[in-house]
Amino acid sequence: MKTIWINAGELSGDMQAAALLTALREREPELAAIGMGGPNLARAGQKNLFRVESLSVMGIMEVLTALPRALHMLSRIKKEMARLRPDAVVLVDAPEFNFRVAKIAHGLGIPVYYFIPPKIWAWRTGRVRFLQRYVKRLFCILPFEPAFYAKHGVQVDYIGNPLVDMVNWPELKKIEPIKGRIGLMPGSRRKEVEALLPEFGKAARILLQQGRDVTFHCLRAPNMPEEKLRALWPSDVPVAFDAPEDRYTAMR
């Protein structure tokens, strides 16, 4: 039985990686998956040895504070990877962390694949040398990326964005926009939400005080309990917190 290690460093990557794992298991039902992920990968059948929620950080000060935790996690990943010896490692987004995981896997002789590689065509192009050295093949979700990576001698495939298949487009097209409804998207990182949502609430209060005919809907990330969000929101400002599974309907 083949075993892959999927390393998703962000909750958004966890969602993408879950779609990838589901597709892989349709082709190889006996495929085992271990690694780092969140609730979506867990539902897709991965045994999460490390939780992605413990890694997500925002801002330079929080990054510095989280550095010892990240280094400790990398040490544990190296130990588990050496013990379990997966057949392949699939990295998902989050280059600041996953580049270090790539070095670990490469040092152990485990082939490394990158799903949703960093946008080095936009900035810090020199990072392509890292991919040339440590990554066996890239799987891109943007159609123009393969030409860029191929030009630099990196093996690459364009596989499309799996999230597109998750959206029920015919049903979404039936939804009529609601005049005056304002959608709020504070993110999925704890510090990010704690910083942004109270400010969103202040702005919402100003709009209501001005007599605007508006309502507010906040898109809740899967890792954010509604009670946590309500504690950050002004109690005198009405708001609806939409469940994560309703996000596309709410955005439409």
Question: At which residue positions do the language-model features occur?
Answer:
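Short acidic alpha-helix that forms the nucleotide-activated donor recognition element
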Residues: 245-252
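Proline/glycine-enriched tight loop/beta-turn segments at coil->beta junctions
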Residues: 177-178
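Short, aromatic/basic amphipathic alpha-helical patches
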Residues: 228-236
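Glycine/small-residue-rich hydrophobic helix-like segments
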Residues: 216-218, 225-226
